[in-house]
């Protein structure tokens, strides 16, 4: 049984409305993300102005994001490799 033209238009309209809503939400979130990125940049600039090494700060943040066990395993492997190379 074929869909009636009215039903097809309604479905198309609903899909278009949903698509528009999704696109607008993504655009709004992208704007927020850009704003947050600017805020983060400002905090790093403040840290640098106060004498902190921003590369080290970024590394610490990266480390804190990871699971404790995963971090310990990576540190153990790093230590092993450094010993093998006579670096410690």
UniProtKB/Swiss-Prot annotation:
<dbReference type="Pfam" id="PF10073">
    <property type="entry name" value="GapR_DNA-bd"/>
</dbReference>
<dbReference type="GO" id="GO:0003677">
    <property type="term" value="F:DNA binding"/>
</dbReference>
<protein>
    <recommendedName>
        <fullName>UPF0335 protein M446_5200</fullName>
    </recommendedName>
</protein>
<dbReference type="InterPro" id="IPR018753">
    <property type="entry name" value="GapR-like"/>
</dbReference>
<dbReference type="InterPro" id="IPR036388">
    <property type="entry name" value="WH-like_DNA-bd_sf"/>
</dbReference>
<dbReference type="InterPro" id="IPR046367">
    <property type="entry name" value="GapR-like_DNA-bd"/>
</dbReference>
<comment type="similarity">
    <text>Belongs to the UPF0335 family.</text>
</comment>
């Amino acid at each position: 049984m074929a869909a009636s033209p009215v039903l097809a238009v309604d479905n198309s309209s609903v899909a278009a409305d949903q698509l528009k809503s999704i696109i607008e939400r993504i655009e709004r979130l992208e704007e927020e993300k850009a704003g947050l990125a600017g805020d983060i940049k400002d905090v790093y600039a403040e840290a640098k102005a106060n004498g902190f090494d921003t590369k080290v700060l970024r590394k610490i943040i990266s480390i804190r994001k990871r699971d404790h066990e995963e971090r310990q395993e990576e540190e153990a492997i790093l230590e092993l490799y450094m010993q093998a190379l006579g670096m410690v």
